[in-house]
């Protein structure tokens, strides 16, 4: 059974509840906009939300509880005080220290964010009062929304195209914004400028989960019933008709079925029952209902995925894509997938539903707040890396240039053929090493623990010598890759000499080509003047064969 992070699960368009199991398998690298971030920045990310008309905006939090934004900044949706786009992450100073419990976004876009303290902040597009601050001015910075919410703790938020919902800890729903089709649930079609509690049939109900389509709203109550209101032109309310609904109405066709979660696409709806079954209704022009055809459905219709129990459903109000995950870990997708209409659930190779939206949805936006918080449990590789040069657990010390490097005999024997033989019958706990320098030998031992090397291109030449001496083929390849990154006209001949000396043929060819391409400058360097006679002779001969000396 999956354990949830604080708050309800709510697939509300882009609502934000993530499970601890999903924390282990989310990969922001699948979202193109993160290519603008450095490796160092990516390593600090704790949560992330990709939004915008083309997946061209992102908000993310770091392990230091700082919030950063990046992208085109339409309508000031980045909240940085202006409408300038940015390819460099900018920090939201006004929210520093705030922990996000739930986050959603609209089409403008506008942002609604709930903190773990139960506060609500909004910013961005506001032409329809979807920010809930009583105005229609775009919000360039986060604004604390407290009207009618001052004594409430908000635990979940959801955004439609231009309207907003929040769910409080006592099971109440508040709504505001665009209301042309009754999506605010007030009984009229007048826009709602500030938060207003949604009552009617929800008056004495305890709501557990909320969601928004483009212009409709959904709520699941603690008894498993589903209540719907707003636009219904495609049957997305599941009431058997196409008339709009200005106040909450129970989906009677689900009588006797206990629903746990609801998710809304652009104009279609998915629900997940307590028995792990999916029902869908609404627009189906892309096959997003998964029923095997493209006919709209105004009543809940079963979606057959596989015999395994479904534990997660996914949809977002800006897309016509649907996804689900089974208890066995299988992920399925259907609907609009990169221009194709997939009319039945298709088994993917993904391990989480988030990847479906990163790779196949249009636009490629997140359907919930991604969480990339690292798991406390270390992998085997991480544990080994941590133990490198650790005197508390080591049973062997190498003395190099007067400095100790701490290691573990069993690991060295497993990882290196040389140590397997040299340490086989040895009872020594100190080994003096004079053949190689301290930086080079330490880098070698670290490689045995991590599979990576951390040396400058110049120092990597020494490690290449060691790799050749110990017949470490993979290490030799890594050294060559590192050395290539540091080549220049001044050191090209020296690196070529090293490549020849250590029989690094790939590096030798690379250095030779570099020298030929920069021949005039290279032949004027001190390295060329001091070049070994035999090497010089071979270089000139080979250069002549490739036409380097032609007029």
From Swiss-Prot:
Expressed in testis and heart (at protein level). Residues 394-457 form the BTB domain. InterPro entries: BTB/POZ_dom, RCC1/BLIP-II, Reg_chr_condens, Signaling_Regulatory_Domain, SKP1/BTB/POZ_sf. GO terms for biological process: cell population proliferation; digestive tract development; liver development; lymph node development; spleen development. RCC1 repeats lie at residues 64-115, 117-169, 171-222, 223-274, 276-326, 328-382. CDD domains: BACK_RCBTB2, BTB_POZ_RCBTB2_CHC1L. SUPFAM superfamilies: POZ domain, RCC1/BLIP-II. It is found in: Cytoplasmic vesicle, Secretory vesicle, Acrosome. It comes from the Eukaryota. GO terms for cellular component: acrosomal vesicle. Keywords: Cytoplasmic vesicle, Repeat. PANTHER family: BTK-BINDING PROTEIN-RELATED, RCC1 AND BTB DOMAIN CONTAINING PROTEIN 2. The BTB domain might play a role in targeting to acrosomal vesicles. This is RCC1 and BTB domain-containing protein 2. It comes from Mus musculus (Mouse).
């Amino acid at each position: 059974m999956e354990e949830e992070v604080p708050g309800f699960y709510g697939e509300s368009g882009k609502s934000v509840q993530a499970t601890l199991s999903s924390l282990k398998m989310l990969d922001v690298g699948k979202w193109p906009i993160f290519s603008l971030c450095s490796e160092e920045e990516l390593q600090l990310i704790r949560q992330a939300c990709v939004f915008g008309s083309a997946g061209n905006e992102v908000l993310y939090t770091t392990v230091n509880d700082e919030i950063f934004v990046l992208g085109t900044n339409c309508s000031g949706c980045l909240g940085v005080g202006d409408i300038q786009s940015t390819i460099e992450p900018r920090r939201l100073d006004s929210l520093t220290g705030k922990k996000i419990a739930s986050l959603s976004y609209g089409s403008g876009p506008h942002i609604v964010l709930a903190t773990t303290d139960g506060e609500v902040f909004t910013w961005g597009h506001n032409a329809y009062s979807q920010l809930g601050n009583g105005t229609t001015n775009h919000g360039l910075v986060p604004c604390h929304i407290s009207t009618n919410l001052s004594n409430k703790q908000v635990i979940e938020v959801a955004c439609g195209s231009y309207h907003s919902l929040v769910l409080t800890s006592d099971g109440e729903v508040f709504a505001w914004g665009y209301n042309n089709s009754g999506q605010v649930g007030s009984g009229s079609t007048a826009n709602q400028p500030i938060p207003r509690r949604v009552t009617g049939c929800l008056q004495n109900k305890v709501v557990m989960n909320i969601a928004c389509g483009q212009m409709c709203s959904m709520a699941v109550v603690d008894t498993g019933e589903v209540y719907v209101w707003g636009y219904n032109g495609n049957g997305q309310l599941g009431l058997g008709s196409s008339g709009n609904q200005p106040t909450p109405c129970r989906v009677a066709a689900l009588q006797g079925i206990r629903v746990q979660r609801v998710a809304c696409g652009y104009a279609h709806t998915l629900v997940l029952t307590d028995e792990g079954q999916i029902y869908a209704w609404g627009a189906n022009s892309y096959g997003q209902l998964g029923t095997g055809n493209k006919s709209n459905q105004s009543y809940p219709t079963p979606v057959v995925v596989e015999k395994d129990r479904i534990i997660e459903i996914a949809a977002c109000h800006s897309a016509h894509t649907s996804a689900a995950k089974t208890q066995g870990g299988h992920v399925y997708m259907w609907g609009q997938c990169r221009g194709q209409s997939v009319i039945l659930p298709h088994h993917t190779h993904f391990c989480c539903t988030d990847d479906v939206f990163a790779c196949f949805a249009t636009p490629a936006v997140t359907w919930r707040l991604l969480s990339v918080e690292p798991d406390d449990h270390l992998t085997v590789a991480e544990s080994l890396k941590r133990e490198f040069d650790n005197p508390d657990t080591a049973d062997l010390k190498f003395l190099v240039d007067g400095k100790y490097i701490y290691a573990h005999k069993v690991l060295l024997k497993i990882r290196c053929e040389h140590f397997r033989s040299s340490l086989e019958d040895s009872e020594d706990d100190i080994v003096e090493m004079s053949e190689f320098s301290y930086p080079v030998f330490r880098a070698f031992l670290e490689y045995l623990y991590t599979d990576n090397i951390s040396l400058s291109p110049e120092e990597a030449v020494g490690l290449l010598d060691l790799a050749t001496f110990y017949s470490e083929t993979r290490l030799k390849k890594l050294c060559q890759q590192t050395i290539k990154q540091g080549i220049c006209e001044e050191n090209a001949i020296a690196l070529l000499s090293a490549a020849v000396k250590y029989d690094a043929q790939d590096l030798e060819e690379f250095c030779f080509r570099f020298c030929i391409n920069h021949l005039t400058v290279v032949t004027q360097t001190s390295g060329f003047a001091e070049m070994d006679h035999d090497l010089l002779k071979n270089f000139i001969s080979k250069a002549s064969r490739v036409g380097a000396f032609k007029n």
